[in-house]
Amino acid sequence: MEVFEPGQDRKVAALRTSFHVHFFVGVILMDYKYMDLAFVEAEKAFKKGEVPIGAVIVKDGKVIAKAHNVKEKSNCAVNHAEILAILKASKKLRNWRLDGCDIYITLEPCPMCASAIKQSRIKNVYSALKNKDKNNETIIKEIFKSDMVNSSVNLFNNLFVEKSETLLQNFFISVRK
């Protein structure tokens, strides 16, 4: 497992084309439009009174699943954006193995979601914001580098820090009024 953050040991550059904005980290290519879709999902969660986290799963340049948190509405602790997106993607592909898929999420995954990502064989995780909990960071790294499952996961963190922090701060301000 490799963990990349802008400004750390890698040159980061944005290339604007007429259709998309691409984000280069070494040889890894991230398309901004998918992260934008994850933020659209996060906004849906916000409007429903859910913690605003969104997830988008992409395979071969096509969106195959989108989801947002619905934990409160469903009264189910596992209904995180990443889990729901994985369920939708697996159903669409008729396979629990999501080989060749990438996931775009607005916040670094919790350990439960990281385990599901690893088990699903998702290759790249693009996270808008790193979870500030140091225990979470340690656990996530251990999950992604574990050889108990024959898959390798690359984690790209802190790609849209300000946008994600603002969304989360606004949500928690609104629920504490």
Question: What are these regions, as identified by a protein language model?
Answer:
Residues 21-25:
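Short hydrophobic alpha-helical segments enriched in small aliphatic residues
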Residues 28-48, 96, 109-177:
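Zinc-dependent deaminase
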Residues 95-107:
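Immediate flanking context of iron-sulfur cluster ligation sites
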